[in-house]
Amino acid sequence: MSKPRKQQKCKTCGHTQFDVNRYTAAGDVSCLRCGTVLEENPIVSEVQFGESSSGAAMVQGAMVGADQARATFAGGRQNAMESREQTLSNGKRKIKRIAAALKIPDYIAEAAGEWFRLALTLNFVQGRRSNNVLATCLYVACRKERTHHMLIDFSSRLQISVYSLGATFLKMVKALHITSLPLADPSLFIQHFVEKLDFKDKATKVAKDAVKLAHRMAADWIHEGRRPAGIAGACVLLAARMNNFRRSHAEIVAVSHVGEETLQRRLNEFKKTKAGTLSVKSFREVENLESSNPPSFEKNRAMELKISKKLQQQQTDNFEDLSKMTEEEKQSVFGKLSKEEAQKQLLMNTILSDITITTENLNDQMDRILKMKKSSLENSLYKTPYELALANGSEQDPSKIWNINKPKNLVANLPKTDDILQNVSSEVELNSDDDDEIVLESKLTEEEVAIKERIWTGLNHDYLVEQEKKRLKQEADELTGNTSKSSSGNRRKRNKSSLPAELRKELGDIDLDEDGTPRSAADSAKMYISKTSVSKKINYDSLKGLLGGNMGF
């Protein structure tokens, strides 16, 4: 039984009877006793129905979604929608079409539609092809549900590049912060590949063996860092051979969409494991088998062993060659080394050559090396004069020892600057680097100089001919006496000063001393004005009386 509705009371007088003004659009609610207005412009949240002009029932009002910017009204355009809603509707319709073509369930297509809605909200769709985004949303939904669909399936169906689709997928995972995306398990693709290869009634058995092979490869670290399609293809090929089905590499490649070389590489990696050495019966019966090292580890280990063997063989060959050398040949080989370094080199070659060495010889050599190191270290350490005196057995006053070692007449014995400059030649020695190997290699021979001159003459032939014509014409004019002054000589020289002629005349001559300096301040002002241009900012009338009218204005 529902509870009775609580009766509304006036907040001022507590009266329970109210009047609703139905004659205005506001619909105010007021108390009948005190006249207090309780509600102004009340909003009715219940659904109301009306009648259209044709008599059909219609709902009054409009629904506004959480992701909508405004309400949609059926006014001039029937069923008017926003551009965002149209994009979302078209995207979901295309997703369902792609899902139907690839036999993807409807619930996965609906999940892909929600992923597309999220991508649209974060503006991930802008600037990208719609097919790439739609296929990526479907692939993310398939990965979430752990289906057997691959990116290349969407690529072949939509006729787009698988690399472009993969790049869009990686960017979408980063933009939408998809962190809980599970890794693709190779066993998910095995059933799909088996169905395409048509194993008939033994399809279940082949799939079971292939799944067990995939788990074995995962235990042997072959699955890490590899494409799951390549692992699944190799497992299906091995399972087919285990059940006496002849399937070629080309058939597996056509189904799994991986390269034949990749497929063979997975088979070679499985061959090097402990499970690869078992028979078919033993492999099916064994359960707990020790896992092998990763293929990359074995590859690096083999490379390291190969390098170490090569180095050891090289050291052995060097020692054999050294043992066959005479003393003169050894001296030429170790001539650049000091005596101690040569002995160390011989000792190291002896040790690395695996020749039997007695313990006494080895200890003697080590003691000798340690003594040499100790003596060199002692000699290299700095000792004060007082310590040297104590080492010599004489105990003197330390201050006297320091005074003995103090330099005397240091400044007086230093060479003078003139003595040093006398040893420095003031002439430039152009041939000082003639004996340098780099300079000698840079110099050209006579044949190279002739070739270079011939090339330069050919490149500048027109210029040389023109200069020769000018020279011959000038000589002919001089012989005939048809010489005229240059146009530059006839030109009137431009005055350096821009003073008017009248002003220069009023200035008069400038009295100069023997060294060319003006004798008075007036002459200095005249010189300055005559050299500089006329300035509009100088009042020349007041400049006349500045020096008592001696300027000549």
From Swiss-Prot:
Q: Name one GO biological process term.
A: regulation of transcription by RNA polymerase III
- The region called Interaction with TBP is annotated at 281-553
**Gene Ontology CC entries for this record:** nucleus; transcription factor TFIIIB complex; transcription preinitiation complex
Record key words, sorted: Activator, Metal-binding, Nucleus, Repeat, Transcription, Transcription regulation, Zinc, Zinc-finger
Q: Which Gene3D superfamilies match?
A: 2.20.25.10, Cyclin-like (1.10.472.10), Single helix bin (1.20.5.650)
Repeat (sequence) positions are 98-174, 193-272
Question: What Pfam families does its record include?
Answer: BRF1 (PF07741), TFIIB (PF00382), Zn_Ribbon_TF (PF08271)
Describe, as the record does, how this protein assembles with itself and its partners: TFIIIB comprises the TATA-binding protein (TBP), the B-related factor (BRF) and a 70 kDa polypeptide.
Query: Which gene codes for it?
Result: TDS4
- Taking the first listed entry, what is the main subcellular location of this protein, grouped into a coarse class? nucleus
Its annotated compartments are:
Nucleus
Span list, region Interaction with TBP and with the Pol III subunit C34: 98-272
Q: What is this protein called?
A: Transcription factor IIIB 70 kDa subunit
Domain of life of the native organism: Eukaryota
Source species taxonomy: Eukaryota, Fungi, Dikarya, Ascomycota, Saccharomycotina
Question: Could you confirm whether the keyword Transcription regulation appears in this record?
Answer: yes
- InterPro entries hit by this protein: BRF1_TBP-bd_dom, Cyclin-like_dom, Cyclin-like_sf, TFIIB, TFIIB_CS, TFIIB_cyclin, Znf_TFIIB
The record places its TFIIB-type zinc fingers at 6-39
Q: Which GO terms describe its molecular function?
A: RNA polymerase III core binding; RNA polymerase III general transcription initiation factor activity; RNA polymerase III type 3 promoter sequence-specific DNA binding; TBP-class protein binding; TFIIIC-class transcription factor complex binding; zinc ion binding
Skewed-composition ranges (Low complexity) = 480-489
Q: Where does Zn(2+) bind?
A: 10, 13, 31, 34
According to the UniProt record, where is the region Disordered?
473-523
Q: Which family does it belong to?
A: Belongs to the TFIIB family.
Query: Record's CDD domains?
Result: CYCLIN_TFIIIB90_rpt1 (cd20553), CYCLIN_TFIIIB90_rpt2 (cd20554)
- Reported function: General activator of RNA polymerase III transcription. Interacts with TBP. Binds to Pol III subunit C34 and to the TAU135 component of TFIIIC.
Nucleus as a keyword of this entry, yes or no, is yes
